[in-house]
Amino acid sequence: MPRSRINGNFIDKTSSIVANILLRIIPTTSGEKEAFTYYRDGMSAQSEGNYAEALQNYYEATRPEIDPYDRSYILYNIGLIHTSNGEHTKALEYYFRALERNPFLPQASNNMAVICHYRGEQAIRQGDSEIAETWSDQAAEYWKQAIALTPGNYIEAQNWLKITRRFE
């Protein structure tokens, strides 16, 4: 049974009903409808913390989805789950793939920066200042990309860039 039919939350049910109506009204291909259904079910599972089910739905959504913009959000959400699971290498891969398809996704750049910054901090704790500097430089580049797209956001990142003298 599609997840949209088992949600107990009134808002989720209402959103699912509206989405189903829109899918019937708006001219879309069967592949687009299938991809959206999997994506919607993935978001529902993810919001409930059912990451394995969410991943399964997102992976299924990538098969029929050909639109690069829509696909970027699927890949971004896969990256979010891998981040939550502590699988940072996989997360970076999916954020990167999302940005390849949609370079105007500042949240993906921000999340990549956060992971790089975290790895830089780990390297500092391990006493490897050269690796730490490399990771921190990479974090700075990703944060600059995110800030360029949404200048009013990521204030903490902007402050970090200024403090570390990486802001141009």
Curated annotation (Swiss-Prot):
Q: Which SMART domains match?
A: TPR
Annotated Pfam families: TPR_1
Pinpoint the residue ranges of every TPR repeat in the record. Answer: 35-68, 72-105, 120-153
Subcellular location(s) of the protein: Plastid, Chloroplast thylakoid membrane
Q: Which SUPFAM superfamilies match?
A: TPR-like (SSF48452)
Q: Which Gene3D superfamilies does its entry note?
A: Tetratricopeptide repeat domain
The record gives the membrane topology as:
Peripheral membrane protein
- Does the UniProt entry include the keyword Transmembrane helix? no
Where the protein is mainly located, per its record?
plastid
Provide a GO CC annotation, any one. chloroplast thylakoid membrane
A single GO BP = photosystem I assembly
* Highest rank taxon of the organism: Eukaryota
Q: Identify the keywords attached in UniProt to this record, alphabetized.
A: Chloroplast, Membrane, Photosynthesis, Plastid, Repeat, Thylakoid, TPR repeat
User: Which InterPro entries would you find in this protein's record?
Assistant: PSI_Ycf3_assembly, TPR-like_helical_dom_sf, TPR_rpt, Ycf3/AcsC/BcsC/TPR_MFPF
The family assignment reads: Belongs to the Ycf3 family.
PANTHER family with a match to the protein in the record: CELLULOSE SYNTHASE OPERON PROTEIN C, TPR REPEAT-CONTAINING PROTEIN MJ0263
Q: What does this protein do?
A: Essential for the assembly of the photosystem I (PSI) complex. May act as a chaperone-like factor to guide the assembly of the PSI subunits.
Entry protein name: Photosystem I assembly protein Ycf3
- From which source organism is this entry? Amborella trichopoda
Q: Where is the organism placed in the taxonomic lineage, from the top?
A: Eukaryota, Viridiplantae, Streptophyta, Embryophyta, Tracheophyta
